[in-house]
Amino acid sequence: MKKFLKALVSIMLVLATGCSSKTVKTSNSTKESSAKTFDGNYYNMINNGRSKNSEKFYLNFSNTKDLVTIGSGLQILSTKHFSTNDYYLSEGLQLTPTDYNNLLKRDSAGTKEEDRKYPDTLQIESGKTYEGLQSPVLVSNITEQDYYKKSGSSYALKGISVAIILDPKEQIDGKLSSPAITLSDEKLRSYAQQCVKKAYKYIRSKKKKLADVPVMIGIYRANNNEISETNGNYIYESFCEGGSVGTLKNVNHENVYFTSTRATKLDPATASEFATIKSNLKKASTEAAGLVGQANYIDDTIQTMKITAHLNIKTYTELLYLTSVIADNINSKFTQDFNIKVLVYSQDELMAVIIKQKGEDAKTSILEQ
């Protein structure tokens, strides 16, 4: 029963943080769900099937926090161009495994131009030195999201978003170096611009039905888990349409741990308030208690925070009391209004979940037997 409740709460977390609001199955006989389950900040969904690149994408990022933030960040960037009121989101299915190979693979060093299998690659030419790096591989993967408009009972593709994921590594004796290499901002921007131009040209020329479809291209810098546990972030975006490559714009997405030096510098008020909540919890607890927060910022403004609370409770009453302390504090101490979710653990077991939606009071769910 408890496993069932945990699964139910996991679903509630997804619903509370908001990803979409409908599920629509697209097939020869399209069916649309009438139930609205998420808030209106994100997209209604249609199901056209699974991307053939999903397995490779999962293998690349399953051990990193990039697995989620690449997709969620791409949706956030897409909302500027494809309104959540008018568009439906689908798994990206326009680029095939062949397309991914053409963009991500490269010919071996010394291959004659007329013999090249991958003339459209986004990668640096094999064997070349770039920024002092030996034969680097700069793009690790690509992922896609499709955006549809509904007309009657049918759906028409009206836009796609593509994330180009940079994870620069040298290739030495056929093996990729680890950890990843850091490029200068100037070279990073120059290379990102090249990737956008090449990718958009490829999509328009090789995918004929996409020739007139707007394409939003985001450049994502993957996280290096050997340096930091925080996920990567989008650094550039370009909206391309009508055959014209859009201006490469800086993107300011950042994920920050609380408490940390970076949190104090970026958002001193919230950092101080978080420290107060943490102190109040410790004072209320008879045993060790701790809080760790991770917040998402866009343009230096906090959007969401996930808090993990580690308690050492001995009774059910103590669990109720300490979760109420946390809920009361996140209601009253934060001066900025943003979405918050709190996972409450005791002895490494999930015991409660607290959700605070922007503009609302916190709501607590206790996982009982």
Give the residues covered by each predicted segment.
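Sec-dependent signal peptide recognition
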Residues: 2-10
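Post-signal peptide N-terminal segment of secreted/secretory-pathway proteins
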Residues: 39-148
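Short edge beta-strands and adjacent turn/loop segments
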Residues: 135-170, 285-311
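Acidic, serine/threonine- and glycine-rich low-complexity intrinsically disordered segments
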Residues: 185-289, 296-298
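Hydrophilic extracytoplasmic domains
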Residues: 262-267, 274-369
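C-terminal motif of bacterial Sec signal peptides marking the signal peptidase cleavage site
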Residues: 15-18
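Bacterial signal peptide processing site
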Residues: 20-22
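Short, non-transmembrane amphipathic alpha-helical segments
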Residues: 182-209, 317-339
